[in-house]
Structures are given as C-alpha cells and as structure tokens.
C-alpha cells in the first residue's frame, strides 16, 4: 500500500500507471503526465524508514493494549473486547504497511522475474489492509452500539451484551471483513470496488452521527431517571458517558486520519484529470502516514481515558527490568 517504492493497493486498484510497478519515479511520471513542470503533480516522497518505524511503534503499542485487556479481569467487558478488536485491526493495518515497504524494497533490487511474485505478495498484504480497515469500521460501530445500550438499556444491558454474544459478534465481524477484503482485492479491476469502499466509509459516518445525536440528546434524561433508582445508577451512567466520550474521540481521530485516503479515492473516481484533484492525489504517501498514525494514536487515547488500563500498562511494563520507567510512572 505504500507507494513510495511501489503503488501498493493502488496497483491492485489500477489507480496509477498499470504498466509501471515498484519505482517512485514511475509513480511521479504517472501523476505528472501532461504536466511537464512537475511541482505539485510529482508524487510526494516519504522515506521507507518512516513507514517501518511507525509500524514497529504501532505493533508494540497495540500488543500492550491486547495483553493488558487479556490480563486484567476488570477489563473483561464488551466495550474493552471491542477495543481489543479495534487494536488488532489498527495493528494489522500499520504493520502490513511497514512490512510491505520492506518486502517491496527488497524485491526492487531483484530482476524482473520476481515482479509477478512481488505483485502476489502485494495483493496478500493489501487484502490484510483492506480487511483490517473494514474490521476497524465495524469495531467502531460495535463500540458505538455498545455505548448506546449501556446508556439507554442500563438495567437490561448485562442480559443483552453477554460475553458469549460479544465473542460471536467479533468473530462474525472478522470473518465477514476478511472475506470482503479478499474479494475487494480480487475484483479490484472494477471501479465499483472503490465506490463500495467510499460508500461504506461515509455510511459509517452517517450511522455514527445519527447514533450520537440521539445518544447525547437523550442521555441527560436517562441519567435523571436512573438517578432516582437505588444503588449507584448515577455513577454507572457517568462511567457510561465517559465511555461514549472516549468513543467520540476515537471516531474523530479515525475520520481525520482516514478521510484524506477516501477523498483520494473519491477524486480518482470523480475528477482524475482535474489539476486540483491530481495535486491532492500526489500526496498519497502522506495519507498513508496519517493512516499509520491512527494506529499509533489510538492506544494513547485508551491510556489517557482509562485509569484501569493505565494501571495495567504500568504493571506489564514493570514486569520487565525497567525500573527507571516504573519509578517515573509511579509519580503520576
């Protein structure tokens, strides 16, 4: 998917010159065709080391999230299980991008006989990236639905969202997204695939917006109703609203990091020859960096918004001989 040294997903989707594969110069030539002055039309170069570094950071951070949720029984709740699914998706997107950079860099030094093998490897990695993107969208939507149930069906929530049902939902999400991701790459010759991806992204945004408008408009009313009941209803609802706010932040970061990529696809479909659209598309590598940054930022959001998760992070880190870090973290 990284087009610094190859066209990645766009080779599969035929967004760049179909006859060229693997070199940054070819990408620039494809974009700059008909624009001899180059400039904005030249493909923005990003060092492969940047992709690899972000991939490694994302891998370590998201593994920490997954291990923390598995380790701490207090985090064995539907919301955190969905967060775990989101962490896996983020990790796969970022690591696949970094891995693809390494593979293509190595294969570019070989002769043309390895080109077909390069394409096959690239298609496999792109399938993983596409599947993980769909899983990210579905995981975010699942977290939103979970927050909706905690706020509006607080008394019946534990009967509705059981661990078994959550496991089935997550399994179905990944099974469906894996099949869809593979099919999207196999049939990527058709523009309908790109339109489908764009439609799914914007449909998700509309669903999220609708859910949140209803959720936050009615939240105060339900908090007042729960408050009159015996027990700690107010505290519970406050916690639920905190979870909803956390999800709002996650969705905001997701939109900021992924929107340029989908705008890129939209411009390719709607105005591939327009100078402004071509100029926007020439920054494709920057949009890939933003996507990888999403996978790096999400674990930081989890840590900042959840004291329990923060505490578990410290316990895991302190398990290793990192006394200096533990001593520093104990002050906060």
UniProtKB/Swiss-Prot annotation:
Residues 1-43, 107-123, 187-191, 272-280 are extracellular. Its main location: membrane. GO terms for biological process: adenylate cyclase-activating G protein-coupled receptor signaling pathway; feeding behavior; insulin secretion; positive regulation of bone resorption; regulation of eating behavior; regulation of metabolic process; response to food; response to insulin. GO terms for cellular component: plasma membrane. It is a multi-pass membrane protein. Hormone receptor that acts as a key component of the leptin-melanocortin pathway at the intersection of homeostatic maintenance of energetic state. Plays a role in regulating food intake: activation by a stimulating hormone such as anorexigenic alpha-melanocyte stimulating hormone (alpha-MSH) inhibits appetite, whereas binding to a natural antagonist like Agouti-related protein/AGRP promotes appetite. G-protein-coupled receptor that activates conventional Galphas signaling leading to induction of anorexogenic signaling in the hypothalamus to result in negative energy balance. Belongs to the G-protein coupled receptor 1 family. This is Melanocortin receptor 4. It comes from Mus musculus (Mouse). The gene is Mc4r.
């Amino acid at each position: 998917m990284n087009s610094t040294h190859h066209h990645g997903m766009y080779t599969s989707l035929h967004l760049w010159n179909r006859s060229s594969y693997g070199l940054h110069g070819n990408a620039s030539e494809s974009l700059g065709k008909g624009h001899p002055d180059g400039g904005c039309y030249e493909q923005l170069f990003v060092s492969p080391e940047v992709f690899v570094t972000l991939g490694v950071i994302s891998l370590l951070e998201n593994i920490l999230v997954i291990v923390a949720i598995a380790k701490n029984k207090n985090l064995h709740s539907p919301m955190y299980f969905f967060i775990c699914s989101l962490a896996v998706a983020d990790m796969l997107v970022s690591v696949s991008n970094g891995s693809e950079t390494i593979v293509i860099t190595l294969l570019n030094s070989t002769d043309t006989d390895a080109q077909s093998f390069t394409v096959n490897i690239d298609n496999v990695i792109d399938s993983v990236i596409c599947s993980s993107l769909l899983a990210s969208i579905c995981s975010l939507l699942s977290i939103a639905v979970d927050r909706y149930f905690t706020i509006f069906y607080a008394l019946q929530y534990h009967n509705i969202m059981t661990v078994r049902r959550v496991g089935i939902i997550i399994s179905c999400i990944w099974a469906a997204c894996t099949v869809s991701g593979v099919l999207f790459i196999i049939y990527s010759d058709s523009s309908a695939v790109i339109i489908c991806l764009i439609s799914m992204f914007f449909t998700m945004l509309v669903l999220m917006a609708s859910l949140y408008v209803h959720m936050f408009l009615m939240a105060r009313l339900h908090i007042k109703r729960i408050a009159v009941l015996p027990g700690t209803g107010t505290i519970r609802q406050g916690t639920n609203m905190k979870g909803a706010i956390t999800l709002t932040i996650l969705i905001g970061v997701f939109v900021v990091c992924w929107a340029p990529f989908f705008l890129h696809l939209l411009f390719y479909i709607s105005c591939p020859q327009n100078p402004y659209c071509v100029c926007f598309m020439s920054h494709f590598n920057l949009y890939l960096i933003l996507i990888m940054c999403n996978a790096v930022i999400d674990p930081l959001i989890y840590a900042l918004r959840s004291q329990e998760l923060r505490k578990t992070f410290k316990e895991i880190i302190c398990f290793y001989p990192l006394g200096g870090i533990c001593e520093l973290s104990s002050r906060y």
